[in-house]
């Protein structure tokens, strides 16, 4: 089974920059998207062979997630079921026969860490939500988690200490999530691989220099870790400031 996740930084814009071509070529069973920045009714494109599920933010042109699945899920839910967290279209959960898939676009703490306090509350609620699901079936979590977990996960870690995405608080919450029963699929297979990033600033020729961050993940319930066949970073795929990430399960 092949699964793909991509923060497209605006799906309509990405459609003009190779999204459909990549989607067709990779032929994923499930394709998850973050930061759609659109409402479903604005879509002037179709993805034949895929069921579509959208969760858009109340605020137009902001945030949003979507799941495209070849197999129709047993059930699909939107959000965490907590009003204060469910206005920005950040979570879609699809239940399948053997597992849950959770597609997430984690809130960015923002420049000046304006949303760090909210982010901490979000992290606790999201972790609790995943653990409830995990009691029922194994869980696959994908998306832009907006945190580089370890120093190896970003190029310039020294100068980014305490910047959004690499604060001690955000990293500690990621550690809490993993410790609670989840495996970072990429580090499971490639624990010491350097230069593996999924997001690059549009400034300072960051992508050209590979001065990036690994903030997009596939996490797997620990009891399914031995089913991880590969965890992929498609760094050569442009179209967004993020690149797609993939998970192949046995």
Model regions and ranges:
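Structured beta-strand-rich core segments of catalytic domains in phosphoester-bond hydrolases
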Residues: 37, 43-109
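Surface-exposed cleft-lining segments at the edges of enzyme active sites
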Residues: 81-82, 107-123, 158-163
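Metal-dependent phosphoesterases centered on the DNase I-like endonuclease/exonuclease/phosphatase
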Residues: 30, 51, 125-211, 215
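N-terminal, active-site-proximal structural segment of metallo-dependent hydrolase catalytic domains
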Residues: 1-47, 51, 57-62, 78, ...
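Active-site-proximal beta-strand elements of phosphoester/diester hydrolases
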Residues: 1-9, 98-110, 142
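Active-site beta-strand/loop signature of hydrolases that rely on acidic residues for catalysis
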Residues: 7, 23-41, 101, 130-151, ...
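Active-site beta-strand termini and strand-to-loop segments that position acidic
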Residues: 70, 94-97, 221-222, 247-250
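Conserved beta strand-loop-helix elements of the APE1-like EEP
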Residues: 60-75, 194, 203-226
């Amino acid at each position: 089974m092949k699964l793909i996740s991509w923060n497209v930084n605006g799906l309509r814009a990405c459609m003009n920059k190779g999204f459909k071509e990549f989607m067709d070529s990779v032929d994923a069973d499930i394709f998850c998207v973050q930061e759609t920045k659109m409402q479903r009714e604005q879509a002037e494109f179709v993805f034949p062979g895929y069921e579509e599920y959208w969760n858009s933010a109340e605020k137009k042109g902001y945030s949003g997630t979507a799941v495209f699945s070849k197999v129709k899920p047993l059930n699909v839910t939107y959000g965490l079921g907590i009003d204060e967290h469910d206005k920005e279209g950040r979570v879609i959960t699809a239940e399948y026969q053997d597992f849950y898939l959770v597609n997430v676009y984690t809130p960015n703490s923002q420049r000046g860490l304006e949303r760090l306090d909210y982010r901490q509350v979000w992290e606790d609620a999201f972790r609790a939500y995943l653990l409830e699901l995990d009691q029922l079936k194994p869980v696959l979590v994908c998306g832009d988690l907006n945190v580089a977990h370890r120093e190896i996960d970003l190029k310039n870690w020294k100068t980014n200490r305490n910047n959004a995405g690499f604060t001690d608080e955000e990293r500690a919450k990621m550690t809490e999530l993993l410790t609670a029963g989840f495996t970072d699929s990429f580090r499971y297979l490639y624990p010491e691989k350097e230069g593996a990033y999924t997001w690059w600033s549009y400034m300072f020729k960051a992508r050209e220099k590979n001065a990036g961050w690994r903030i997009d993940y596939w996490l797997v319930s620990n009891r399914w870790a031995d089913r991880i066949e590969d965890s992929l970073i498609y760094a050569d795929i442009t179209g967004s400031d993020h690149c797609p990430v993939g998970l192949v399960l046995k």
